[in-house]
């Protein structure tokens, strides 16, 4: 059982992107849900609007599945939850699982949330801080606050590390002789 990374209240994951070390790859995945109320599905989970949300419609666990076309390196999962707005719909226990498909998923994180308000940053790294490589991620809501039945999640973002290109590793041309040949005419 782990607790998510401590981040300042409301820490926007877009700040991670601005550092240039990660990029959001949710658009590369095929998203599916275990259930949803009409008008409260994947589109609302991915629309960058903190006022909209996915609402499940059925028994627990409530599942969000992300499937990638090829094995993908993932570093951080960000979930937006708001206890003040959602009360008993707010997740209190979440399991994050990865694998090649539905049949071999393995839990890599289990989170206990206490009245969350804002972005929850979940590292998807091993003990050596190495990012996970996977075809599939499953986020399972195992319990809600106040024993609520259905759940609300307002946003989910998934990040991969940005790899340095070899072009940036070449030394700069600093002498006049080198500068004459730095571009093609």
From Swiss-Prot:
Pathway: Protein modification; protein ubiquitination
PROSITE patterns, sorted: DOC (PS51284)
Record-listed N-acetylthreonine modification sites: 2
Organism: Bos taurus (Bovine)
N6-acetyllysine sites (modified residues): 169
GO biological process: anaphase-promoting complex-dependent catabolic process; cell division; protein branched polyubiquitination; protein K11-linked ubiquitination; protein K48-linked ubiquitination
Keywords: Acetylation, Cell cycle, Cell division, Mitosis, Ubl conjugation pathway
Transmembrane segments: none
Keyword Ligase: no
The keyword Ribosomal protein is assigned to this record: no
Protein name (record): Anaphase-promoting complex subunit 10
Disulfide bonding pattern of the chain: none
Function: Component of the anaphase promoting complex/cyclosome (APC/C), a cell cycle-regulated E3 ubiquitin ligase that controls progression through mitosis and the G1 phase of the cell cycle. The APC/C complex acts by mediating ubiquitination and subsequent degradation of target proteins: it mainly mediates the formation of 'Lys-11'-linked polyubiquitin chains and, to a lower extent, the formation of 'Lys-48'- and 'Lys-63'-linked polyubiquitin chains. The APC/C complex catalyzes assembly of branched 'Lys-11'-/'Lys-48'-linked branched ubiquitin chains on target proteins.
Primary gene name: ANAPC10
Every DOC domain range: 2-185
Family named by the database record: Belongs to the APC10 family.
PANTHER family in UniProt: ANAPHASE-PROMOTING COMPLEX 10, ANAPHASE-PROMOTING COMPLEX SUBUNIT 10
SUPFAM superfamilies (UniProt xref): Galactose-binding domain-like (SSF49785)
Cellular component per GO, a single term: anaphase-promoting complex
Pfam families: ANAPC10
Superkingdom of origin organism: Eukaryota
